[in-house]
Amino acid sequence: MKTLFIGCDISKKDFEATLRADDVEQSIGTFKTNPHGYGELRKAVDKFNKADYQIHLIAEPTGTYHLGFIAYAYEQEWEVSLPNPVVIRQWAKGQGVRIKTDKIDAHTLAAYGFKEQPAAENSLPTHVEELDLMLKRKDDIKKSLRQEKNRLESYVHRTTGSDATHQSILDAIAFYGAQLLEIQAAIKSYLKQHQDLAKQRTLLSAVPGIGEQGVLKILVFLYRWDARTASLGNANGLVAFAGLDPALHSSSTSVYRRPTISKMGDSEIRRTLYMSAFGGMKAKSSPLVDFCQ
């Protein structure tokens, strides 16, 4: 079956769409980033898709704005690919694209899909997506709590102040502290409801260095990698997905830069893995000590 690629540049309010099949390319307009807009896109695609092609959506991850659209695409049984924005930018430069507009970006995504034929991705399991949201909310609460505690520490060193300001900071600390306990209890209860996640957490926790602070983030990351590669990924690809693959820069004998990591993946997971490795190195019986030495 032939494939009809849809390149979509998605923003908070709307998105631009371009179709590409064989040698035919067509911009089909701008649509609202909401269920009505998704339906209007479907109507426009159906008018073009007279040969009953397989639909393959190509879009860049844009915070959370793309999530509703991607869920809709899976409901329509479309194939979906979410290439790394850095990869798309570099690919576009290689194609000689010098202009950046929403319409050009949609054109680039459709052309990338048509020429590179990226593998379709699976959707992330709903219960993993919900766990991920709770983990992110916990991080947000911890950040707000830390900020308020820093404000309190700064406040007590002031020579002047007000009782209202002091009490407001104390109230905020109490509020965020209670919220943190609540979301932690919710995560614990959620894992009891989903024994598959609980068992996988136990297995990951057996790896030296992976503790309670990072194990669930790493578990979600592995699920996301599995979905991104349709369960066909390998170890090298996983390392690259985290942005830990080596970035070499040398040419003959005249050009050489110290190798670094690419940092093209999720910076949060790199921080989590770094802290896990650091913790693993501190344990006397950890095999990481012998490995690194």
What kind of feature is each model-predicted range?
Residues 218-293:
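Phosphate-backbone recognition surface of nucleic-acid-processing proteins
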Residues 12, 63, 87, 220:
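Short, glycine/acidic-enriched loop or turn micro-motifs at the edges of active sites
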Residues 81-205:
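Long, charge-rich intrinsically disordered scaffolds of nucleic-acid metabolism proteins
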Residues 74:
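Anion (oxyanion) recognition and catalysis
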Residues 2-21, 109:
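Gly/Thr-rich phosphate-binding beta-strand-loop-beta motif of the actin/hexokinase/Hsp70
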Residues 211-212, 238:
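Small-residue hinge/turn detector
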Residues 24-52, 56:
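Nucleic-acid-processing active sites and adjacent nucleic-acid-binding tracks
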